[in-house]
Structure formats: C-alpha cells, structure tokens
Amino acid sequence: GVWDAAYLQKVDYDLWLGPAPAVPFNRNHFHYNWHWHWAYGNGDTGNQGPHQFDIARWGLNKNEHPTTVASVGGYFGPPASQETPDTHTSIFEYADGTVFEFATRGQYTNDEGTQRIGNLFYGTKGWVWIDGDGRKWQSYSGRRNEKGPGSEAPPSSGGSDPNVLTSQEGAHYKNFVDAIRANDAKVLTCGVEDGHLSSALAHLANIAYRVGRKLKFDGKAEKFVGDAEADKLLTREYRAPYAIADKV
C-alpha cells in the first residue's frame, strides 16, 4: 500500500469509507482512484458511462431497462492495484430488439467521427456522432459518408446547428435545489428515475463482466432471471453504521 499521512489531515477516513470495508488507508484507493476498486467505485463504465448513457437513451427513446446484457474486457495497463477493467465492451438488448453497445477503451484506440468520447447512432441511411457533452454533432449519409446537417456542415447541406443541447448548468443546479426545498419531485425538470435508468446500465454491465456471462434482466422486478450470483451484486454488504435500509 501507499501511505501518506498528509492526505488525511482534513479527512474523516471512517466517514470517507462509509459502507465499504474498514481497511488501512491506501493513497491508490483514495480521491479519484476510488473509481478503479470495486469496494468504492464502478470503473470508467460507472464514471464516464452515465454521462453518455443519458444521451444514448434520449436518442434511442429508452425509458426502460434492457432485457439482456453481455460484457467482456479486462485490465491491460501497466502493473497497478486497479481491479476494474480499463478496456470494457458491453452490449445491451431491449425488448423491441434495439441493440446498444458501450465501450471503454483505456489504451490506444481510433477516434470515431473525430470523437474520443461521445455517442454514435446508426440508421438505415447514415449515422450521426454526438460529442461527450452533447453540444456538437454531425450527420453523414450514404456509402460515401457525405456530410449532412450538423455542427461541422455548411448551411447549404440542409441546416447547421452548433448545439444539440444548450448549456444550462446553472439553471439545472438551481432546479435541483428548488425541488429539495419544496420537497416536491414534480418541480424537477428531469426526474430522478432518469438518473436511475442511466446508472443502472453501468451496474448491469459491471455485473455481467464480473460473473462472466450474458445475463437476462427482469426490468419490472429489477432482478436477474434465474441467476442468484448476479442478483447478489445488485447490492452490497453495508458496514455499520452506514447501512441503508431496503426501503427508504
């Protein structure tokens, strides 16, 4: 382990651990690095993933859980304490046959439509990339990938809009605080369930990766079909006094 007392001068380490097991301090498991250890984090699929899952679900119009998930990958970087994969591909299938693929490429890889982080949507006549923030986009059509409407296309192509989403972080935060103060979820411009559905994709992907097999998921019950081992990973063992009740 890596020990440096200076890191803990202003930190309540027991509180920082929360429900995770009480283990000696290790700087490699601490701020930000916690993402890469199962006791605290969910890898980059749970770190960057939900940002992109939101956009993907909007584009696919999916307000439900997938019915199956398959996931493969591994850690292929230099020797480290990291437990989560740095290379990770997951495929989700929905009840209507829609297939959604998510990939984390921790090592060398190609760009996709000039984007290293973002979403790609494929249709019958072409495809579209959307950047990681959802603010730039570009469409292409036909076998020659001719540019259509988008952030990089001239107006003569059928219209050019520099933004898919308008930046409204300030109003977004204010809306969240207003909803808390009003104790009324209806005040929210984006419901809590949206965050749950996007975050669940990361958890489903990681569980399929950890058990090493394709899984069927019952979205209504929020349980795996006939897989007790996978079901155990839907929650965790909570360390007292940081336990959370099954019903909150």
Language model regions located:
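Contiguous beta-strand/loop segments that form the cofactor/metal-binding neighborhood of enzyme cores
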Residues: G1-V248
